[in-house]
Amino acid sequence: MAKLTKRMRNIREKVEVTKEYDINEAVALLKELATAKFTESVDVAVNLGIDARKSDQNVRGATVLPHGTGREIRVAVFTQGANAEAAKEAGADLVGMEDLAELVKKGEMNFDVVVASPDAMRVVGQLGTILGPRGLMPNPKVGTVTPNVAEAVKNAKAGQVRYRNDKNGIIHTTIGKVDFDAAQLKENLEALLVALKKAKPTSAKGTFVKKVSISTTMGAGVSLDQATLNTQTN
């Protein structure tokens, strides 16, 4: 416990809570403070100017980060016929229909993403109570229900992140690992913010991206100066 206290004291001494950091300075600070015995993820929290109580202002989608997330993603695909072969060629780890559903029902879910072709939703629909709470239910809004399952598999393997605002209008996701270099983390974050801006609901008024902060798995959040990021959407 004393070790944790020392770590937290160090973080509090180094991080100015009210300061908005240049992205490169922020990344350098996170790297300095990342002392866990594993390679920590770099996570981002984006406060959006939306009313999360209104369904037409909720933001949900997916985007492929240019440098991936640093995680090896296992993909399960519900499909059949030619699509099954295409999914396997694209690198899917598990492909099937009823047989794959039986594995899920048994609790054998050694995968991170589930993709389904539209004709397979009759099977996947029966698994909603299992996949839904785990955030694994395929959804066309994030490209995981699609006739082009091969592309969905490639995107997932390439480092696609899915995002969805919480009840406070905040997006939480990951943009890589602490051992990525600063330029990679910056470009990943910029790609995410561009995707979010493109997903801005038409009914959302005022400043859309209100605050951006990054943190490591075990570290404190560092607020960013958005002027140091290139997030032009045109």
From Swiss-Prot:
<dbReference type="GO" id="GO:0019843">
    <property type="term" value="F:rRNA binding"/>
</dbReference>
<keyword id="KW-0694">RNA-binding</keyword>
<keyword id="KW-0689">Ribosomal protein</keyword>
<comment type="function">
    <text>Binds directly to 23S rRNA. The L1 stalk is quite mobile in the ribosome, and is involved in E site tRNA release.</text>
</comment>
<dbReference type="InterPro" id="IPR016095">
    <property type="entry name" value="Ribosomal_uL1_3-a/b-sand"/>
</dbReference>
<dbReference type="GO" id="GO:0006412">
    <property type="term" value="P:translation"/>
</dbReference>
<dbReference type="InterPro" id="IPR002143">
    <property type="entry name" value="Ribosomal_uL1"/>
</dbReference>
<dbReference type="InterPro" id="IPR023673">
    <property type="entry name" value="Ribosomal_uL1_CS"/>
</dbReference>
<dbReference type="GO" id="GO:0006417">
    <property type="term" value="P:regulation of translation"/>
</dbReference>
<dbReference type="GO" id="GO:0000049">
    <property type="term" value="F:tRNA binding"/>
</dbReference>
<keyword id="KW-0678">Repressor</keyword>
<dbReference type="InterPro" id="IPR023674">
    <property type="entry name" value="Ribosomal_uL1-like"/>
</dbReference>
<dbReference type="InterPro" id="IPR028364">
    <property type="entry name" value="Ribosomal_uL1/biogenesis"/>
</dbReference>
<dbReference type="GO" id="GO:0003735">
    <property type="term" value="F:structural constituent of ribosome"/>
</dbReference>
<protein>
    <recommendedName>
        <fullName>Large ribosomal subunit protein uL1</fullName>
    </recommendedName>
</protein>
<keyword id="KW-0699">rRNA-binding</keyword>
<comment type="similarity">
    <text>Belongs to the universal ribosomal protein uL1 family.</text>
</comment>
<comment type="subunit">
    <text>Part of the 50S ribosomal subunit.</text>
</comment>
<dbReference type="InterPro" id="IPR005878">
    <property type="entry name" value="Ribosom_uL1_bac-type"/>
</dbReference>
<comment type="function">
    <text>Protein L1 is also a translational repressor protein, it controls the translation of the L11 operon by binding to its mRNA.</text>
</comment>
<keyword id="KW-0820">tRNA-binding</keyword>
<dbReference type="Pfam" id="PF00687">
    <property type="entry name" value="Ribosomal_L1"/>
</dbReference>
<keyword id="KW-0810">Translation regulation</keyword>
<keyword id="KW-0687">Ribonucleoprotein</keyword>
<dbReference type="GO" id="GO:0022625">
    <property type="term" value="C:cytosolic large ribosomal subunit"/>
</dbReference>
